[in-house]
Amino acid sequence: MQMDAVVILLILAFPIASVYVLFYHKKRVDGLSEPPGPPGLPFIGNFYQLYKAPCIHEYLCTLSKRYGSLMTLRMGSVPILVVSSPKMAKEVLKTQDLAYCSRPMMTGMQKLSYNGLDVAFSPYSEHWRQVRKFCTLELFTQKRAQIDFRHVHEQEVSRMIARLSETAAASKDVNAFECFSNLATSIISRVAFGKRHDEDGIGKERLQRMLSELDTMLSVYFVSDFFPMFGWIDSLTGMRARLDRTFKEMDMFYEELIDDHLKPDRPESLTEDIIDVMLKNKGCSSSSLTKDTMKAILLNVFNGGTGTSASLLVWAMTALMRNRGVMKKVQEEIRSVIGKKGNVDEDDIQNLPYLRAVVKETMRLYPTGALLIPRKTIESSIIGEDKDHMYMIKPKTLVYVSMWAIGRDPEIWKNPMKFVPERFLERHDINYQGQQFEYIPFGAGRRICPGIHLGLTTVELALANLLYTFNWEPPVGTRFEDINDETVNGITLQKKNALYIRPKTYMFS
């Protein structure tokens, strides 16, 4: 939410708050109250506290240490439940999943998902169940990620390594996010529509700019999300017009991609891309896939498949630069297994347990979704850590599960602030399938991310080749100790300061 919108809102809220404080009394339902939380101001609730927090996920983590693993806040009239323990995460995401399985229709999400036609942001409905089934069984299968698109991953990683080799030869630094974002965008472009984003006039700059604006519009809160009566402020500040421009540009982009696939003279590809699969399914009489639904799914593919993978690679390299002993150990594993073959391919990854532990540890300490995509309750429920601390959660409550807090809880993880991949060598039972609720980087339950295999394949293969081919140093004049891990708000966890690193080509003796 922009600063000018905040000022206008606070000025308008004051007289309403005066009336509110006279007549509002907190009610108990069936003898049960809502979970505790920080006191807020009349009418606006905890809005100002959350707005001024530099990093909301860190602020909520700090608050949970005081108020507990179930904590209530309010943004205007909207109640928010923050969940910060594995036990309560399991209750919300599995045991009582049906009560918590919907999504709030935030302004940005609603507009950009074609009024909830996608799989990630759509409210719980029959439409969502059908789209989810299609994505799980047709689009994002393990076979499609690891076999059908194997050549895409390996070719694009090789292209990245070749560019970095030129950088190393010139003794230049690399902006890690730009490098990894370019890789992820190239892979997703080929997977989604069959060609690299810098081919045939698609335009690298155009696509990168659109994806950046898309991420912003999905991350930002609009005044109308929490204060509907003041929704006109979004128009006054230009946010509504900005959202409309973003939607129009993305819609035109999707339209171009789909129309290109419908051309009768389009060359056949050996591997179906995602648009091919959707068009084939759309032609079936039983299909519910409309063109707008296809576009909404493409939103999830681009938003979830580019920023998340790039961010995870940045955090992995950040952690390794800050922990040189771990860097050395994982490089020794990779180089001893691969030898002088020249590159790491997907078949090699299963023989690199320490590398895979590094990826897991990165997602524990730096989860790309520090707060899982919010859910919205569709019915009342009663939850609590024990029988003496049971609470009533009302319908239409926004629910955030804090992976940031769970991943850094000393009662769950030994030395949680230290980067120790060995913990995942000792815990072979921990995986990405959402069964161990102390570790659910991709979510859990019926809302678990369907694109797990595609994202993991990209990250593991890229990281393995980065560590196999190069040694890494900070820029000249910078020490390893100067590399920090400060974060900023966003739909995916981002570094506050860009990571610049210098590759040095490793020479086998």
Swiss-Prot record:
Family: Belongs to the cytochrome P450 family.
Keyword NAD: no
Positions of the UniProt region annotated as Substrate specificity: 368-373
Biological function: Involved in the biosynthesis of coumarins and furanocoumarins (FCs), natural products required for defense responses against attacks by predators with potential medical and agroindustrial usages such as anticoagulant, rodenticide and artificial vanilla substitutes. Catalyzes the conversion of xanthotoxin into 5-hydroxyxanthotoxin.
EC number(s) per entry: 1.14.14.-
Necessary cofactors: heme
Topology within the bilayer: Single-pass membrane protein
Binding site for heme: C449
Site keyed Substrate specificity: positions: A120, G304, T308
Enzyme class: oxidoreductase
Name of the protein: 5-OH-xanthotoxin synthase
GO molecular function: heme binding; iron ion binding; monooxygenase activity; oxidoreductase activity, acting on paired donors, with incorporation or reduction of molecular oxygen
InterPro entries given in the database record: Cyt_P450, Cyt_P450_CS, Cyt_P450_E_grp-I, Cyt_P450_sf
Pfam families reported in the protein's UniProt record: p450 (PF00067)
Transmembrane annotation, as ranges: 5-25
Organism expressing this protein natively: Ammi majus (Bishop's weed)
Disulfide bridge positions per record: none
PROSITE patterns: CYTOCHROME_P450
Presence of the UniProt keyword Transferase in the record: no
GO cellular component: endoplasmic reticulum; membrane
Catalyzed reactions per annotation: xanthotoxin + reduced [NADPH--hemoprotein reductase] + O2 = 5-hydroxyxanthotoxin + oxidized [NADPH--hemoprotein reductase] + H2O + 2 H(+)
Protein's cellular compartments: Microsome membrane
Keywords in alphabetical order: Endoplasmic reticulum, Heme, Iron, Membrane, Metal-binding, Microsome, Monooxygenase, Oxidoreductase, Transmembrane, Transmembrane helix
GO biological process: coumarin biosynthetic process
Pathway involvement of the protein, from the record: Secondary metabolite biosynthesis
Signal peptide extent: none
